[in-house]
């Protein structure tokens, strides 16, 4: 384990969220995923690049599939693939290569410091791509990764994560 990962494991073990093996304590899974999401906000992910709003996550996924670029939906679009509960406010995708993916999808970078709607591409990091699933022909990150990302997201994403965790009714 890297020192930062070990630090988080120690913190979460001290407050009773994980056991000595690093596994979530029964009944504490949602609490652990909430804390992980809040500690790793989507807006601050390493290598994340924002692009001008335009295509939906599903459209971008199709462009990437046609170009042979590895990807996985997350955030509200990913949560909706597991259980539809809200409109898509912010397309966020993990990709194997941000520049190639942006080119294939015809995305234009947002100006630094600009606000408003956006599309965000985040490079795979060795963890986010583990457990991906195909849902109706679209690749989506593992359910727990969607939940972490939704808890680390904006607006209705937190509610979507709660719905996926059974903490709220759609």
Question: Model-derived features: where do they sit?
Answer:
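Helix N-cap and loop-to-helix transition residues
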Residues: 4-5, 75, 142
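Short amphipathic alpha-helical interaction segments
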Residues: 2-11
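Short gly/ser-rich loop at a beta-strand->alpha-helix junction or flexible surface loop bordering the NTP-binding
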Residues: 16-20, 24-125
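C-terminal regulatory/effector modules of DNA-binding transcriptional regulators
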Residues: 98-170
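Glycine-centered loop/turn motif at secondary-structure junctions
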Residues: 1-2, 15-17
């Amino acid at each position: 384990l890297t020192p930062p990962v070990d630090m988080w494991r120690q913190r979460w073990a001290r407050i009773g969220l994980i056991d000595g093996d690093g596994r979530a304590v029964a009944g504490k899974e949602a609490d652990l995923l909430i804390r992980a999401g809040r500690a790793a906000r989507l807006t601050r992910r390493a290598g994340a690049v924002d692009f001008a709003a335009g295509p939906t996550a599903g459209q971008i996924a199709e462009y990437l599939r046609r170009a042979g670029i590895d990807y996985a939906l997350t955030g509200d679009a990913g949560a909706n693939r597991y259980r539809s509960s809200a409109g898509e406010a912010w397309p966020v995708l993990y990709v194997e290569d941000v520049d190639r993916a942006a080119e294939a999808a015809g995305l234009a970078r947002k100006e630094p410091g600009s606000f408003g709607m956006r599309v965000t591409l985040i490079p795979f990091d060795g963890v986010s791509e583990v457990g991906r699933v195909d849902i109706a022909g679209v690749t989506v990150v593992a359910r727990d990764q969607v939940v972490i990302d939704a808890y680390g997201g904006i607006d209705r994403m937190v509610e979507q994560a709660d719905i996926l965790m059974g903490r709220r009714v759609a």
